[in-house]
């Protein structure tokens, strides 16, 4: 009998162990990593977290472009997610390593989040660690300008209500990096990131070591760690939480997800665009980026399908939406916004391409008449006319001789094809007025100097300049279109020993480094530069690089 009881006890114990084993395994937390750049953070987590309590999974497969989709199919469920990569532009995590090509676009993260196409992988996330610059920067990427309030008043709101609603819409549509990350990681209780510059992996690793050595691990608890935030505080680490359905941005997230959700057809997405454009135009303006982006993504194949074609035709035929949209566009304060809205109106069939050009030229005419043409206007005009689509439109602008003589106006006219404007801008580049030189810089960023004659004119003009700041700017402009003719290069070589400014000498070196050295006596020039160069106040510089280049060649 005692033997039977002993055997029965052993059997029960064995069954209990077998049943308990999956529970024990299930209790292990899974730390997933997306290592786009530095592996220091991931390796520190692996080194300090006990492997009997944590599983570690790297989601990136080198050389496999569809690594995220492949990870979604594995059945892995992450409790913790580490993402390491540069993030300065706010559009993707990327690497500066030459031996790696992997990257993680924010668009892809939004698609996965909105489509719920990867429900297992991120369904039980408790913590996300975003090791990249500005990942949780709260600065607004979009702002509500004064026309928002004017539009709401036209729609029937009182002035006070319009201002209050504009503030609310501005906050809702600000779309900072922080907002993007919160929307992507919906319902995740703890999201760590950086409001500014983040430490590189080689610096972040030791800080994480100090965190793990300072006390018991809190990783995967779903609670923000004051110890971790304290250690990274000098590096701008901050924390946020993913929104739930009660969050003030939940409605915006639902709207934005319409364009990223793979479960919706293109026709359904175009239908949502039409629904959205029936709202207050103030909100349409603040959502313009998403509308433009989706419209641009519709290829000819999509547009040619009966369902999409019919949905677009409904938008084109909506006279009320067209009238309200164009009224808002013509009242917009920022020329860039006005141009974008006119272009979008063309995409929607509300304006012909000739009418789009006419609206833009009308806008530029108003800017000239009001004396408001700025560097931003010049940049916009040159960008819009990169493909010469405004050829033949210049006669629409009736600038007076006095107006055409102002350098910002001359540059705008030059961007649109004016030969007189082009000549005025070239003279302004070497005229000594810093503001005019800045305008010329912007213009020549988009347009090339026309041959050796213009090169020589600019080079000799620079040599005669007296104002140091303007001279440096002019030289920096020339360095983007370095001369190759001997006469232009000799003008700059003669200027080098005459100037009393090390900044001017450095700027000359910047031009000569990029120029064709074939017409120069390289050994003699290297000796002359070394003999006449001014002492550098802060170590090696562009002049040293040029001297080495001349000696090597």
What residue ranges belong to the model's regions?
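Bacterial N-terminal signal peptides that target proteins for export
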Residues: 1-11
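Bacterial N-terminal signal peptides
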Residues: 9-20
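A domain-level signal for caspase-like cysteine endopeptidase catalytic cores
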Residues: 25-92, 100, 104-105
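Extracytoplasmic/secreted cell-surface and envelope-processing proteins
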Residues: 41-43, 66-67, 89-95, 137-142, ...
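A short, glycine/acidic-enriched catalytic loop
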Residues: 88-118, 134-136, 150-152
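Short, conserved loop/helix-junction motifs that constitute active-site signature segments
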Residues: 115-124, 184-185
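Active-site-proximal C-terminal subdomain of hydrolase catalytic domains
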Residues: 131-292
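Non-catalytic all-alpha helical scaffold/repeat segments
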Residues: 253-553
């Amino acid at each position: 009998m005692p033997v039977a009881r002993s055997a029965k006890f052993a059997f029960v114990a064995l069954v209990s162990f077998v049943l308990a084993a999956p529970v024990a395994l299930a209790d292990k937390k899974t730390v997933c990593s997306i290592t786009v750049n530095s592996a220091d953070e991931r390796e520190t987590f692996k080194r300090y977290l006990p492997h009997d309590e944590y599983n570690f999974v790297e989601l990136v497969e080198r050389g496999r472009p569809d690594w995220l989709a492949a990870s979604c199919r594995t059945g892995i469920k992450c409790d913790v997610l580490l993402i390491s990569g540069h993030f300065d532009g706010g559009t993707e995590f990327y690497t500066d390593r030459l031996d790696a090509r992997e990257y993680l676009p924010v668009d892809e993260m939004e698609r996965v989040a909105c489509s719920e196409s990867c429900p297992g992988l991120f369904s039980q996330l408790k913590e996300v660690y975003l090791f990249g610059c500005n990942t949780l920067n709260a600065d607004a990427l979009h702002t509500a300008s004064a026309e928002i309030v004017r539009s709401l008043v036209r729609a029937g709101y009182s002035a006070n209500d319009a201002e209050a609603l504009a503030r609310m819409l501005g906050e809702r549509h600000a779309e900072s990096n922080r907002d993007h990350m919160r929307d992507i990681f919906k319902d995740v209780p703890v999201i760590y990131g950086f409001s500014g510059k983040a430490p590189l992996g080689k610096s972040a690793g030791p800080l994480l070591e100090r965190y793990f050595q300072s006390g018991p691990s809190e990783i995967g608890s779903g609670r923000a760690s004051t110890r971790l935030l304290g250690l990274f505080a000098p590096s701008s680490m901050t924390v946020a939480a993913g929104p739930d359905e009660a969050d003030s941005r939940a409605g915006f997230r639902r709207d934005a997800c319409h364009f990223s959700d793979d479960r919706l057809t293109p026709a359904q997405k175009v239908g949502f665009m039409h629904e959205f454009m029936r709202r207050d135009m103030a909100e349409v303006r603040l959502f313009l980026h998403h509308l433009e982006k989706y419209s641009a993504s519709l290829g000819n194949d999509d547009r040619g399908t009966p369902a999409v074609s019919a949905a677009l035709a409904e938008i084109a035929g909506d006279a009320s939406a067209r009238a309200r949209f164009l009224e808002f566009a013509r009242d917009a304060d920022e020329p860039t916004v006005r141009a974008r809205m006119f272009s979008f109106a063309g995409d929607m069939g509300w304006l012909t391409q000739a009418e789009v050009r006419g609206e833009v030229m009308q806008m530029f005419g108003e800017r000239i008449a009001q004396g408001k043409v700025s560097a931003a206007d010049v940049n916009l005009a040159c960008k819009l006319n990169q493909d010469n689509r405004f050829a033949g439109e210049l006669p629409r602008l009736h600038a007076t001789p006095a107006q055409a003589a102002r350098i910002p106006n001359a540059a705008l006219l030059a961007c649109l094809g004016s030969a007189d404007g082009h000549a005025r801008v070239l003279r302004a580049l070497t005229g000594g007025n810093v503001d005019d030189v800045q305008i010329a810089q912007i213009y020549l960023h988009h347009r090339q100097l026309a041959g050796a004659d213009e090169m020589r004119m600019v080079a000799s003009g620079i040599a005669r300049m007296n104002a140091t700041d303007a001279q440096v700017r002019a030289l920096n402009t020339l360095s983007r279109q370095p001369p190759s003719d001997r006469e232009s290069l000799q003008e700059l070589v003669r200027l080098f020993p005459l100037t009393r400014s090390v900044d001017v000498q450095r700027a000359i070196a910047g031009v000569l480094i990029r120029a064709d050295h074939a017409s120069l006596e390289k050994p003699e020039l290297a000796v002359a530069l070394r003999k006449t160069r001014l002492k550098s106040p802060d170590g090696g510089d562009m002049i040293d690089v040029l001297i080495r280049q001349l000696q090597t060649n």
